[in-house]
């Protein structure tokens, strides 16, 4: 089912996968959080699980602070930091509701968590300790770091941009340009904007600069839709990941497809084969050679029989991820 | 729009009668839609330029400008942006617009709903609701496949298919009439929506513009009438219109009959593929885009009808200060809004409630076990020493439920929210820890967020 450039990880989690993240400086290690309450670290080339630690509830997101520390949070409301070398765990803090997102901002050296308790909390990773709690208008669904800014996507299609160095006020309050619930936001590597996906098979490319000339450049497109028997099935676009080098991005949807897009030429570069079930998370390695694809049923159609969840590791080529020369 | 009188109006495309905000955008549109080679997709600058290119490079002749409305397909006219448009067509256009503005003034009083639509004009590069090729690349902003490909009336995207049967008979006879409709989708949209909404006036308005200028065409209309007549809802309208027509149009009832035709059906398929959602969310739809360009801050209100949850959350949002017990509890217990989905031709693969997939999954019983209860110490894994003793594994849970004093019912988040009041100061008498905020701690010793240290140590019976 998979080609020689792709394989499935051994010892996958025993329930759905919520998030996959590569180590910041190597494509060797992949951190995986799961609904089976575990967080696992995999040695990708060796295709083996190196380490596993537990939460008491499903883990919804994980992130590397640095190559040796993993942070994770989930339904048990707890934010944990785990030292991957010593296997030591540290309960850093909690939210009042499940933690949905965990991200690290290298520029400001702070960890950020977003929760369904409608707050974003910042954490100093060195101590580690809480460095502030910031109210959001709605439950936080997604977070992305852009330079020294934090882009927060909440329920109600709201998007807030915070300046991590000045959290006294919200830098920008926006509304998603898509009409449906926001699923995922990822910032462009050039810090000019972000990509936002919704549950309705659509992705928007937006810019942070509020000036009208820049705002005119924003656009959106439909994707992850399948036509079957004259009925168009529209799938949520759950995952977005940027390729560090080419500035192209991959999207994964509940249709089980992964597409790679070139945002500047506005073209789709590639679509991989269909995966067994919904794509829950995507992660490019920092060197852009590898893409981790979490294929995990997301209960879009309730609790039903579904193909096995798994994590696929795919070696990507330039042909798949590099922009072609621009057309006129 | 730096010219004096010659233009006077917003730039518009002579080939398809669409309106644009800016001449630059108009030119981009022309290059992409009318001057693009169908063989190699090269964009030329003018009609003749395209013809020459096809001849020289592909050895093919073309005789009509692609995507142009009938009557405007002349490949030999050298038109670039607004330059080169024959004077008489300019005049016609001006007249049309004048009539339209009269129309829209009349309309303004009537039509209060959706002026917005997602299919926001050429000028907007924000969003391509193209009904086609989701699997291909996505189409650059200037190309709006849903619209231009269809010349004239049929070209009116989603909302107009129903118009076709009644209209085509008119078209050949009066191309200039069509312009009354399509130019500037914006305008057209207004008309369309008002079709749905109410309007007997509107359709009349649609026909009006051509009226004075094209008397000879009127006779052409009756042939168009019969088809619309059988449509449901038309008869009543026809009558009503017949009544009002004289007052409005001083035209024979003939035109009225044709116009109502599209009305009943228009409501539904207004934007079939352009995000079926839009059919339901006409109002909020546009406001998503408009406010974005103007004042994002004001855009909290727009999605009223379709997403009540948003409304209520925006309402409650304003009162939110910091994360406190009350708010989360309120949001949880309120019923989530349901998504207004799709039309018959599309299906949104997502549960009906407008909550995230993760929230929905978290509500499943299997994920509710051993979640922290209010006042409960955070359960670490074995390494967290003493707690291991207190928190018996899963089997112990039911018993915990019975134990804990503030035992809220199973909530969305494992009851944690409802329990919040439980660990505000006072709830934990021995420990009344003030700040709900988590004090820094170094893991290791089990330090529950709520400062229930001793109880943690003592035993698990508490929870």
Curated annotation (Swiss-Prot), chain A:
Encoding gene, per UniProt annotation: BUB3
Keyword Cell cycle on entry: yes
Key word Phosphoprotein present: yes
BP GO terms, sorted: cell division; chromosome segregation; meiotic cell cycle; regulation of chromosome segregation
Residue ranges of WD repeats: 5-43, 46-83, 86-124, 128-163, 223-262
Sequence similarity: Belongs to the WD repeat BUB3 family.
Main location: nucleus
Protein name: Mitotic checkpoint protein BUB3
Post-translational modification as stated in the protein's UniProt record: Poly-ADP-ribosylated by PARP1. Ubiquitinated by UBR5, promoting disassembly of the mitotic checkpoint complex from the APC/C complex.
Pfam family, one: WD40
């Amino acid at each position: 089912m998979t080609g020689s450039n792709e394989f499935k990880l051994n010892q996958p989690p025993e329930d759905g996968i919520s998030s996959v993240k590569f180590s910041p400086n190597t494509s060797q290690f992949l951190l995986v959080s799961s609904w089976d309450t575990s967080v696992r670290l995999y040695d990708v080339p060796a295709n083996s699980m190196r380490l596993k630690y537990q939460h008491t509830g499903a883990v919804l997101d994980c992130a590397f602070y640095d190559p040796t520390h993993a942070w994770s949070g989930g339904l048990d409301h707890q934010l944990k930091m785990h030292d991957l070398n010593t296997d030591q765990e540290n309960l850093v803090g909690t939210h009042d509701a499940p933690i949905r997102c965990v991200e690290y901002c290298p520029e400001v050296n702070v960890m950020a968590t977003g929760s369904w308790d409608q707050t974003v909390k910042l954490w100093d990773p060195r101590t580690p300790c809480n460095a502030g709690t910031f109210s959001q208008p709605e439950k936080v669904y997604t977070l992305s770091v852009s330079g020294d800014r934090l882009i927060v996507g909440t329920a109600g299609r709201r998007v807030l941009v915070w300046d991590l160095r000045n959290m006294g006020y919200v830098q920008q309050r926006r509304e998603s340009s898509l009409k449906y619930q926001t699923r995922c936001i990822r910032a462009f590597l050039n810090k000019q904007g972000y990509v936002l996906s919704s549950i309705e098979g659509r992705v928007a490319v937006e810019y942070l600069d509020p000036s009208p000339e820049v705002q005119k450049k924003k656009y959106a497109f439909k994707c992850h839709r399948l036509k079957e028997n004259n009925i168009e099935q529209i799938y949520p676009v759950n995952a977005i990941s940027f390729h560090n080098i080419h500035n192209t991005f991959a999207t994964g949807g509940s249709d089980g497809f992964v597409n790679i897009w070139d945002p500047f030429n506005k073209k789709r570069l590639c679509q991989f084969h269909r995966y067994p079930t919904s794509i829950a998370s995507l992660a490019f390695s920092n060197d852009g050679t590898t893409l981790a694809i979490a294929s995990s049923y997301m209960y879009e159609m309730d609790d039903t029989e579904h193909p096995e969840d798994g994590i696929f590791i795919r070696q990507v080529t330039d042909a798949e991820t590099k922009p072609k020369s621009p057309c006129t | 729009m730096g010219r004096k009188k010659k233009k006077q109006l917003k730039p518009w495309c002579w080939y398809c009668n669409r309106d644009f905000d800016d001449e630059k955008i108009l030119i981009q549109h022309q290059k992409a839609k009318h001057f693009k080679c169908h063989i190699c997709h090269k964009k030329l600058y003018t009609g003749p330029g395209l013809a020459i290119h096809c001849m020289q490079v592909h050895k093919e002749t073309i005789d009509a400008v692609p995507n142009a409305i009938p009557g405007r397909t002349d490949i030999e006219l050298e038109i670039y942006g607004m330059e080169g448009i024959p004077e008489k067509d300019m005049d016609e256009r001006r007249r049309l617009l004048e009539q339209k503005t009269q129309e829209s003034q009349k309309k303004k009083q009537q039509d209060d709903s959706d002026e917005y639509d997602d299919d926001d004009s050429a000028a907007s590069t924000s969003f391509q609701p193209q009904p086609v090729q989701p699997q291909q690349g996505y189409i650059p902003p200037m190309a709006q496949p849903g619209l231009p490909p269809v010349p004239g009336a049929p070209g009116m995207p989603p909302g107009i298919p129903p118009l076709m049967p009644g209209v085509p008979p008119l078209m050949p006879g009066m191309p200039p009439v069509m312009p009354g409709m399509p130019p500037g989708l914006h305008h057209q949209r207004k008309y369309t929506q008002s079709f749905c909404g109410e309007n007997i006036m509107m359709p009349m308005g649609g026909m009006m513009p051509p009226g004075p200028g094209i008397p000879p065409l009127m006779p052409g209309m009756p042939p168009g009438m019969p088809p619309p007549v059988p449509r449901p809802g038309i008869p009543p309208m026809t009558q009503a219109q017949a009544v009002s027509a004289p007052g409005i149009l001083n035209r024979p009832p003939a035109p009225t009959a044709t116009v109502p035709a599209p009305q009943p059906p228009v409501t539904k398929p207004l934007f079939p593929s352009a995000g079926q959602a839009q059919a339901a969310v006409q109002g909020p739809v546009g406001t998503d885009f408009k406010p974005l360009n103007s004042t994002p801050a004001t855009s909290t209100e727009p999605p009223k009808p379709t997403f009540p949850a948003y409304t209520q959350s925006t309402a409650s949002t304003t009162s939110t200060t910091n994360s406190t017990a009350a708010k989360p509890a309120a949001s949880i217990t309120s019923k989530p809004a349901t998504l207004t989905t799709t039309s018959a031709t599309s299906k949104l693969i997502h549960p009906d409630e407008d909550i995230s997939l993760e929230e929905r999954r978290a509500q499943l019983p299997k994920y509710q076990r051993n979640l922290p209860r209010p006042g409960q110490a955070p359960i670490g894994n074995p390494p967290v020493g003493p707690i291991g003793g207190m928190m018996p594994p899963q089997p112990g849970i039911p018993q915990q439920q019975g134990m804990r004093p503030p035992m809220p019912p199973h909530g969305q988040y494992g009851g944690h929210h409802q329990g919040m009041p439980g660990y505000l100061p006072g709830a934990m008498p021995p420990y009344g820890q003030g700040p709900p905020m988590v004090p820094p701690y170094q893991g290791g010793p089990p330090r529950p967020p709520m400062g229930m240290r001793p109880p943690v140590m003592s035993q698990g019976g508490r929870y």
